[in-house]
């Protein structure tokens, strides 16, 4: 099969979910009712749902079977120990706290690391800054509600949709060290390495870059947290693009990657393929004090530390999903599906970020140059795409980035992108062709698409629940 141009999906579809078709008039009414915010649409009114790949895909038969082994004991569940063993074997991390999803881990570890830095290094809360190659929205939100400013230090190629570069998710290493020196190392409670970099377009981070980042962190004794939602996709890109690792397995690359962090926080709803679940893990005894504090907070915020908001069956499913998500054939198919969509869009003149791991990112700023950033061109494009074809996508731009919590001013965004997120093992190549055709219709009417302004704006993570109207 090596000589075929396109290979079919490497799985058989056994269970299907019917979806309904709607009219243009129905969809126009629905998107207005939602406040021009696709997050607020009812899922039954969506024909193809590209909002997120978080918990929205299929699961494997081995994952589903594993649920039957679930031990629902409140404490000391054997399902917890099965999950902790998977974490040790895959990542090499000794201490595991399950959470209901990624933000459950964030709400625990962020205040603990801030407190630790304050007690041990004299951190000044009025001056503290955390760094990342690019913070995911909830990580940024949890940092900000704990009073911590966030700073993204990414390479110049990251958001340039006209440039092809193997590792657009990389840290700007000089910018990282310069920033640490500027704010003072003692005022940096943590560094977050996001793999892959979602906001940059699902772009990978190289192992070489992670190694240097970690050496900088160790120089200043700053803890590193690996934001691990798409750890397997990142490992696949390393295998494909970093020559030193071309003969390594995904498992070997993953184990090597996690040497260059002290903790991991994971939304397991992505590469671990579960509908619900997350992880917070510490590498070794040097972070046992953090583990102890996080366990205490887990009881209050998530549940007892041996279930963390998950039923026993869900922990068993996650223990298997961590392995299933690293299957090489599976990863090759998934990355190829995204590449197919990006290639098809660019063939019709729709500019995209280079294909990443989990989504096609359309450059809405270039498709809708008449709409200024403060009128959210990618959000306007999302609404038009829904009207035209019933496709739900998500804005990754100024609308998501939000305002500076200290000044209230809109934060400058490096690109206005529309993310077409592909759920795992859910849509076929025919769906990709339909999406491409939908963009032909959107492109024909692009000049008539209007910008948006707020009718309701939450102060934190506004993109989830805000309401807007056309200007």
From Swiss-Prot:
PROSITE patterns: BETA_ELIM_LYASE. Transmembrane segments: none annotated. It catalyses: L-tryptophan + H2O = indole + pyruvate + NH4(+). Its EC number is 4.1.99.1. The keyword Manganese does not apply. The modification N6-(pyridoxal phosphate)lysine is found at residue 270. The modification N6-acetyllysine is found at residues 5, 115, 156, 450. Pathway: Amino-acid degradation; L-tryptophan degradation via pyruvate pathway; indole and pyruvate from L-tryptophan: step 1/1. Keywords: Acetylation, Lyase, Pyridoxal phosphate, Tryptophan catabolism. The keyword Acetylation applies. SUPFAM superfamilies: PLP-dependent transferases. Belongs to the beta-eliminating lyase family. Homotetramer. This is Tryptophanase. The gene is tnaA.
């Amino acid at each position: 099969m090596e000589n075929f141009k396109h290979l079919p999906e490497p799985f058989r579809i056994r269970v299907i979910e019917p979806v309904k078709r709607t009219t243009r008039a129905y969809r126009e009414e629905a998107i207005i009712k939602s406040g021009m915010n696709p997050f607020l649409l009812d899922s039954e009114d969506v024909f193809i749902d590209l909002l997120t790949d978080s918990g929205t895909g299929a699961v494997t038969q081995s994952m589903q079977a594993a649920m039957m082994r679930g031990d629902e004991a409140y404490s000391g569940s054997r399902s917890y120990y099965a999950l902790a063993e998977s974490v040790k074997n895959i990542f090499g991390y000794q201490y595991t706290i399950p959470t209901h999803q990624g933000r459950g881990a964030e709400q625990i570890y962020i205040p603990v690391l801030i407190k630790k830095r304050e007690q041990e290094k004299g951190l000044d809360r009025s001056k503290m800054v955390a760094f990342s190659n690019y913070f995911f929205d909830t990580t940024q939100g949890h940092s900000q509600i704990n009073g911590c400013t966030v700073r993204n230090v990414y390479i110049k190629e990251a958001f340039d949709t006209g440039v092809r570069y193997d590792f657009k998710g990389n840290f700007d290493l000089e910018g990282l060290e310069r920033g640490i020196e500027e704010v003072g190392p003692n005022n940096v409670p943590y560094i977050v390495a996001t793999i892959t970099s979602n906001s940059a377009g699902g772009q990978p981070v190289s192992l070489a870059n992670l190694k240097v980042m970690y050496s900088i962190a160790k120089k200043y004794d700053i803890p590193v947290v690996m934001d691990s939602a798409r750890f397997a996709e990142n490992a696949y890109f390393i295998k494909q693009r970093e020559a030193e690792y071309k003969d390594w397995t995904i498992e070997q690359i993953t184990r090597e990657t996690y040497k260059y962090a002290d903790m991991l926080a994971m939304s397991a709803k992505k590469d671990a393929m579960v509908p619900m679940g997350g992880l917070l893990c510490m590498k070794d005894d040097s972070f046992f004090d953090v583990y102890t504090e996080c366990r205490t907070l887990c009881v209050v915020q998530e549940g007892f530390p041996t279930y963390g908001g998950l039923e026993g069956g869900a922990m068993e499913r996650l223990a298997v999903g961590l392995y299933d998500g690293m299957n090489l054939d599976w990863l090759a198919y998934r990355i190829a599906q995204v590449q197919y969509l990006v290639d098809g869009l660019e063939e019709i003149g729709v500019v995209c970020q280079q294909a990443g791991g989990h989504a096609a990112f359309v450059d809405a700023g270039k498709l809708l140059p008449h709409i200024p950033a403060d009128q959210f061109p990618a959000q306007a494009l999302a609404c038009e795409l829904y009207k035209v074809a019933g496709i739900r996508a998500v804005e990754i731009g100024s609308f998501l980035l939000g305002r500076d919590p200290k000044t209230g001013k809109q934060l400058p965004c490096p690109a206005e992108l529309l993310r077409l997120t592909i759920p795992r093992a859910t849509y076929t190549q025919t769906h990709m062709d339909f999406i491409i055709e939908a963009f032909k219709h959107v492109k024909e009417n692009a000049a008539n698409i209007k910008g948006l302004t707020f009718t309701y704006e939450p102060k934190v993570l506004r993109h989830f629940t805000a309401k807007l109207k056309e200007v």
